[in-house]
């Protein structure tokens, strides 16, 4: 009898933990900005809007490792209010000033570029910071490629493209709804940016036929104030084969999984913490190796990541398999 009671207690403790944590997490606040109906209404880009040339308050940036989204390319721009700076005190997510807009546009190279534009834009996602609260929205580009309109819900777009090996692929690309955006960007009861952490911005850029360290470049532009760090960490590119399989795999999980699989994310109850900086013995990876690779390798409701992909990422799956095999 005592053994049965102990067993029931052991089984109920995780359930009680999840219930109590759900109560403490609360709800994500409603938007405190009114999103405009058209992307052009913001005046973020000058000239032909589809060229995505940022206005004078916008700065393009690149990440060391980026989210996989059905092999789509991305253009990332941060727009800051005039005279304001991004402030960083460690290698995580910096503080962005009130009024910051982060725009990320998704596109594929046009297969038939001889008879049309070089790229086909599908969507632009906006994060707008107002009063310390981030707000998320998505805009879908029209077939004329001269405007993107605010989406109230998700949308499906049939696309054809060439993958990294030059193979023609087809899929029904899914543009996320606001609810989908929140699912990935939510940390406890707040929405936060995912990509532009200092360690992920810590990479080399190619500008004017020369190379420059991106953090130094942003400081030179006068838009980044960063405290001296005893050790400025670097998130490696998971595509860089000069890095170890371990570092590449952990970087891959940081940008593709850890926004949900961390103690503050929406998948906290899985007891996986896939952040790059988390020690291996605290991640849960060793206990859930089969489940991790199994869910990456199937499509449908069981697929991971749950949002933003309709195609298996063959290169990512191979990388994670190699990493998990190295742990055995």
Q: What kind of feature is each model-predicted range?
A:
Residues 19-30, 112-328:
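Sequence context surrounding c-type heme c attachment/ligation sites in exported
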Residues 2, 37-43, 318, 325-326:
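Polar/charged alpha-helical tracts
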Residues 1-27:
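Bacterial Sec-dependent N-terminal signal peptides
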Residues 25-90, 96, 107-110, 121-127, ...:
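Conserved small-residue
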Residues 1, 38, 48, 60-63, ...:
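Serine/threonine-rich low-complexity intrinsically disordered regions
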């Amino acid at each position: 009898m005592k053994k049965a009671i102990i067993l029931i207690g052991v089984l109920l403790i995780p359930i009680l933990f999840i219930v109590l944590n759900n109560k403490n997490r609360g709800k994500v606040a409603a938007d405190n900005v009114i999103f405009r109906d058209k992307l052009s209404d913001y005046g973020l880009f000058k000239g032909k809007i589809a060229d995505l040339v940022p206005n004078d308050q916008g700065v393009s940036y690149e990440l060391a490792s980026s989210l996989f989204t059905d092999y789509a390319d991305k253009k990332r721009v941060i727009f800051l209010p005039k005279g304001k700076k991004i402030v960083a005190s460690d290698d995580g997510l910096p503080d962005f000033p009130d009024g910051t807009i982060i725009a990320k546009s998704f596109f594929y190279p046009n297969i038939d570029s001889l008879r049309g534009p070089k790229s086909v834009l599908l969507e632009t996602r906006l994060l707008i910071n107002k009063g310390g609260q981030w707000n998320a929205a998505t805009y879908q580009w029209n077939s004329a490629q001269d405007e993107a309109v605010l989406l109230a819900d998700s949308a499906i777009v049939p696309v054809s493209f060439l993958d990294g090996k030059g193979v023609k692929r087809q899929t029904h690309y899914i543009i996320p709804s606001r609810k989908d955006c929140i699912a990935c960007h939510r940390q406890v009861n707040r929405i936060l940016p995912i990509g532009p952490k200092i360690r992920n911005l810590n990479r080399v850029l190619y500008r004017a036929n020369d190379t420059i360290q991106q953090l130094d470049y942003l400081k030179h532009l006068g838009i980044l104030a960063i405290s001296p760090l005893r050790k400025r960490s670097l998130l490696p590119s998971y595509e860089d084969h000069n890095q170890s399989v371990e570092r590449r795999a952990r970087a891959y999980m940081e940008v593709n999984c850890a926004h949900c699989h961390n103690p503050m994310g929406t998948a906290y109850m899985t007891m996986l913490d896939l952040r790059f900086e988390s020690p291996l013995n605290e991640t849960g990876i060793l206990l859930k190796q089969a489940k991790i690779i199994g869910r990456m390798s199937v499509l449908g409701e069981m697929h991971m990541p749950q949002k933003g992909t309709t195609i298996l990422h063959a290169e990512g799956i191979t990388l994670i398999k190699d990493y998990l095999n190295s742990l055995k």
